[in-house]
Amino acid sequence: MTTTLGMKKSWELHGQALQVIPMATQTHSKAPREALRGIEPCFLVRGKGCRVWDLDGNEYIDFRNGLGPITLGYFYPTVDDAIRQQMEDGIIFSYPHPLEVEVAERLVRVIPCAERVR
């Protein structure tokens, strides 16, 4: 048995997004599939641990994951605190930040086959 969730707000925004964004998203992998209408969310507005919530307030376990949350989940306090701290100095600079070198060195140390990382 399939239960259809209430997704009125989500699909209304999806229609709006299609007018200005091809496939209603910036990345193909995030595009909602029409075949899963009423089952799969179109937009997520919140996440914590492995759970996410859509625009209509429906809660899901995120089996799709994203590039960031696949390792630690969403709203990981240690990471979020570090981000907030860095935001005071600015983010997304036009040149590399020293932290990039520190992180790359750590990754090369712990990944036996990695000589360099990006």
Describe the predicted segments one by one.
Residues M1-T3, Q86:
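N-terminal alpha-helical segment of soluble enzymes
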